[in-house]
């Protein structure tokens, strides 16, 4: 069984934070999907904030899960054409 190390958790925080900072919505503001894009970003940011909360409480597993949900929302938005490609490096 793999162990969730502090290093792994920090790496996931960095990847998700970078994706949130570099995110670019590619649908115009007058496109009907713009509100959907904003919802995806907001949801991802909320999961990222949850991850920080869990980390501060010492709950690494929940922090890791919340980070995966956050990144999942960003990746889903990219997949349906709301965002530019997200860098993983």
Residue ranges, per PLM feature:
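Long, charged/polar, soluble alpha-helical segments
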Residues: 1-89
């Amino acid at each position: 069984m793999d162990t969730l190390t502090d290093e792994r958790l920090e790496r996931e925080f960095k990847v998700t934070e970078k994706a949130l900072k570099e995110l670019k919505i590619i649908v115009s503001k007058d496109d009907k999907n713009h509100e959907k894009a904003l919802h995806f970003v907001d949801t991802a940011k909320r999961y990222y904030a949850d991850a920080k909360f869990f980390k501060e409480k010492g709950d690494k597993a929940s922090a890791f899960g919340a980070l995966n949900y956050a990144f999942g929302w960003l990746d889903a938005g990219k997949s349906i054409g709301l965002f530019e490609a997200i860098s993983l490096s």
